[in-house]
């Protein structure tokens, strides 16, 4: 039975996250099931600028090409200012979960808005903390939204791409 699942990866660099996204797309995986979360800049003193035109977001700065490239492939691009994180950029289905959490003023046991949204998709508090730390350290979190079959396919593809750093979440 194909039950809903979420698989997650943490990438050290934006290049690694971009390569993984491209590899999944070339392998026939539906990239609309991918969410990427990370900072849009390298320091709080030098933020990246963003503006929207239609459904596209344009960006500048050291990671601007990365986000611009992903926003051409993934859907629901967005940028948020989040206390404790600064500017956080994301794309994919998770964006709507975060917007819902922000609109509903969801507070979950002292977690940030990002943490509350992550917990809403079934991620444990310990994993939420791990992802928040990764994002604050300029790493990138990839979430794959799908069913068991999707997650198994992605895991096989990305295991070939790099060491196994994935973890299934229920």
Give a label for each model feature.
Residues 2-53, 105-170:
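Cytosol/matrix-facing juxtamembrane amphipathic
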Residues 53-128:
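Small-residue-rich hydrophobic membrane-insertion segments
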